[in-house]
């Protein structure tokens, strides 16, 4: 029998931490929290007009970028903060805006030399001698040819010749997260939470940017990543009438409740009540209704595997279900995930309509269709890929959820990431040794394989740090993290073999990857074999006497030994030992 392996175990369903844009302890990570920049009030202005702000450390005065100034007699009707400042230059007025908390833009008058520091959204009008500009002309964090036009607007659109004005307007409204500026009609549109699902690349004449000014730390990619973690959760007073999967439990936060849903293979969405702190896991499509204190969200907010502008055309032969009043494509994905016949979904922005489709959809594919979003039934950070779904449907292959697609030598097998959670998934399991940088995911995996006790690893693509881990994975969300098994070798795993009715050891455990079940079994001293059920994502950890409960030709299951395949173990040898 196997040797004793002392490991501290924490099951996935007990996790409560999730990253929502706030720095938290993370297994040895050196955290660099995202903190909005600010400027203190400046104490002096040089005769030349340069800003000597409290945060300027250089001996040379700071040079202000004034490239976004409306120099064509433009003022702003927006409220002025405090009293106008007299007898200053344009440069000094720009510096004054930067020094005043809450200033989003300013108006300077060439004739009167008066400076009006403004708050709120720029409201431009013709003013003799007027020059108006955003708090910052830095556009380094804007992205060209990127559009979020399909996302719902949270503010009235604004017409301006300067894209920097769009950022000033967005910064003034707490509901705005990002803006999109169209150079052709000089119009800004403003988008709120959930915007990331509507991203389109390659749109000529369009620029998008974050609400936070670039020179104060604004990053569009950061906003996107945070939106894909929590942007689709209902803000307040929205519950779900869908039946609960189990008795509700207390949770520390809405993030902790979401994490419980992520760890349960049956869960499609959840409801958390801010007043009672109770967490309700749901296993069917959302049935939203008004409920005081409730906040409801899907298993995942990640929309990175969706495609915008693609349509499969409605067809009774492939349409399984049509649902109206669906406000976001993520909610459409939940409906698809809850329907066993669904392979992909199609969401129409103008009608708030969700159509879920079965196999055979690909032959109706069209591109360049405005206002339509499509995606796979699998949540993006759980391996969902619309491209893989399309390829499988085009050749008439089996459903991508069955066990064949999870095994080596299958057509869609990619050994680099087959056993890796790529969607901002970290592990809180104990880190082995010193945390060091790695040049790639592969190097981090090799480092894990060089450590005798390493069962899995976490690699952060942003910092390049590699964390070899021991014991059972303890998954949670963390930006940039990827977590994988020690090896992607699945040669000793067997499809269709089921030991799930054998003597279970440890607590129920869930994962979307069968290789994680092997890691969990290896970490559980009494576990000899595991069975993974693809339909529920449940890992059955089975102990001595398992061989008497073997069943063959069971659809959707994968079984394997507790030791990794590249160590030479196999089920046949273990079964022989088990019957001795």
UniProtKB/Swiss-Prot annotation:
Gene Ontology, cellular component aspect: cytoplasmic vesicle; extracellular region; host cell endosome; microneme
Entry's Gene Ontology BP terms: cell adhesion; effector-mediated perturbation of host innate immune response by symbiont; effector-mediated suppression of host innate immune response; immune system process; proteolysis; symbiont-mediated perturbation of host receptor-mediated signal transduction
SUPFAM superfamilies associated with the record: Hairpin loop containing domain-like
Principal location listed in the UniProt entry: cytoplasm
Cystine pairs: 68-137, 93-115, 97-103, 141-214, 166-188, 170-176, 232-301, 257-279, 261-267, 305-380, 332-354, 336-342, 419-488, 444-466, 448-454
Segments forming domain Apple: 68-137, 141-214, 232-301, 305-375, 419-488, 492-565
Domain of life of the native organism: Eukaryota
Regulation: Lacto-N-biose inhibits binding to asialofetuin, a host glycoprotein.
Record-given protein name: Micronemal protein 4
Disruption phenotype: Reduced production of IL12 in host cells during infection.
Localization in the cell: Cytoplasmic vesicle, Secretory vesicle, Microneme; Host early endosome
Swiss-Prot/TrEMBL keywords: Cell adhesion, Cytoplasmic vesicle, Disulfide bond, Host endosome, Immunity, Lectin, Repeat, Signal, Virulence
Subunit structure comment from the entry: Monomer. Part of the MIC6-MIC1-MIC4 complex. Interacts (via the second apple domain) directly with MIC1 (via the beta-finger region). Interacts with murine TLR2; the interaction promotes activation of bone marrow-derived dendritic cells and macrophages in the host. Interacts with murine TLR4; the interaction promotes activation of bone marrow-derived dendritic cells and macrophages in the host.
KW Disulfide bond (keyword) present: yes
InterPro entries registered for this protein in UniProt: Apple, Pan_app
Organism for this UniProt entry: Toxoplasma gondii
This protein's record includes keyword Electron transport: no
Chain's role: Soluble adhesin with carbohydrate-binding activity. Binds to galactose-terminating oligosaccharides. Required for attachment of the parasite to the host cell prior to invasion. Triggers the activation of murine bone marrow-derived dendritic cells and macrophages and production of pro-inflammatory cytokines, such as IL12 (IL12B/IL12A), in host TLR2/TLR4-dependent manner. Triggers the production of anti-inflammatory cytokine IL10 in murine bone marrow-derived macrophages in host TLR4-dependent manner.
GO molecular function terms attached to this record: carbohydrate binding; galactose binding; host cell surface binding; Toll-like receptor 2 binding; Toll-like receptor 4 binding
Post-translational modification: Proteolytically cleaved at the N- and C-terminus after release from the microneme.
């Amino acid at each position: 029998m196997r040797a004793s392996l002392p490991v501290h175990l924490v099951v996935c369903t007990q996790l409560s931490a999730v990253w929502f844009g706030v720095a938290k302890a993370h297994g040895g990570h050196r955290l660099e929290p995202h903190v909005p920049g600010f400027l203190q009030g400046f104490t002096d202005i040089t005769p030349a007009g340069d800003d000597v702000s409290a945060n300027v450390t250089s001996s040379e005065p700071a040079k202000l970028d004034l490239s976004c100034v409306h120099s064509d007699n433009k003022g702003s009707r927006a409220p002025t903060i405090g009293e106008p400042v007299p007898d200053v230059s344009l440069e000094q007025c720009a510096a004054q805006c930067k020094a005043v908390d809450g200033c989003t833009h300013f108006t300077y008058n060439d004739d009167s030399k008066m400076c009006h520091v403004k708050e709120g959204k720029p409201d431009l009008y013709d003013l003799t001698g007027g020059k108006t500009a955003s708090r910052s002309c830095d556009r380094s964090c804007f992205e060209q040819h990127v559009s979020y036009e399909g996302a719902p607007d949270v503010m009235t659109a604004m017409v301006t010749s300067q894209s920097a004005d769009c950022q000033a307007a967005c910064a003034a409204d707490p509901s705005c997260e990002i803006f999109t500026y169209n150079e052709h009609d000089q119009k800004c549109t403003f988008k709120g939470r959930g915007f990331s699902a509507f991203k389109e690349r390659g749109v000529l004449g369009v620029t998008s940017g974050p609400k936070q000014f670039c020179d104060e730390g604004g990053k569009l990619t950061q906003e996107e990543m945070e939106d894909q973690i929590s942007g689709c959760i209902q803000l307040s007073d929205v519950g779900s009438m869908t039946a609960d999967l189990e008795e509700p439990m207390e949770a520390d936060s809405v993030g902790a409740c979401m994490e419980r849903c992520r760890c349960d293979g049956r869960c499609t969405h959840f409801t958390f009540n801010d007043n009672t702190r109770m967490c309700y896991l749901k296993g069917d499509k959302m049935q939203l209704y008004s409920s005081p204190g409730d906040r409801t969200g899907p298993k995942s907010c990640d929309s990175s595997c969706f495609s915008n502008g693609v349509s499969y055309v409605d067809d009774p032969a492939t349409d399984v279900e049509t649902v109206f009043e669906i406000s976001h494509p993520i909610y459409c994905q939940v409906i698809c995930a809850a329907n066993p016949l669904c392979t992909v979904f199609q969401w129409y922005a103008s009608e708030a309509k969700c159509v879920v489709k079965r196999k055979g959809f690909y032959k109706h594919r069209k591109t360049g269709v405005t206002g339509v979003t499509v995606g796979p039934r699998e949540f993006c950070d759980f391996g969902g890929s619309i491209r893989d779904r399309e390829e499988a449907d085009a050749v008439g292959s089996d459903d991508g959820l069955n066990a064949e697609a999870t095994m080596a030598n299958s057509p869609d097998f990619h050994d680099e990431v087959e056993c890796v959670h790529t969607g901002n998934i970290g592990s809180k399991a104990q880190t082995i040794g010193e945390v060091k940088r790695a040049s790639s995911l592969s190097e981090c995996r090799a480092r894990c394989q060089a450590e005798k006790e390493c069962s899995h690893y976490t690699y952060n693509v942003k910092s390049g740090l590699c964390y070899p881990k021991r014991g059972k994975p303890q998954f949670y969300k963390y930006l940039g993290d990827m977590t994988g098994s020690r090896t992607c070798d699945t040669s000793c795993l067997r499809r269709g073999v089921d030991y799930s009715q054998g003597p279970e050891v440890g607590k129920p455990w869930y994962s979307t990857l069968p290789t994680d079940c092997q890691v969990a079994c290896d970490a559980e001293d009494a576990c000899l074999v595991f069975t993974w059920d693809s339909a529920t994502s449940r890992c059955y950890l089975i102990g001595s006497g398992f061989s008497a409960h073997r069943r063959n030709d069971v659809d959707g299951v994968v079984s394997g030994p507790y030791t990794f395949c590249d160590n030479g173990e196999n089920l046949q040898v273990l079964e022989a030992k088990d019957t001795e």
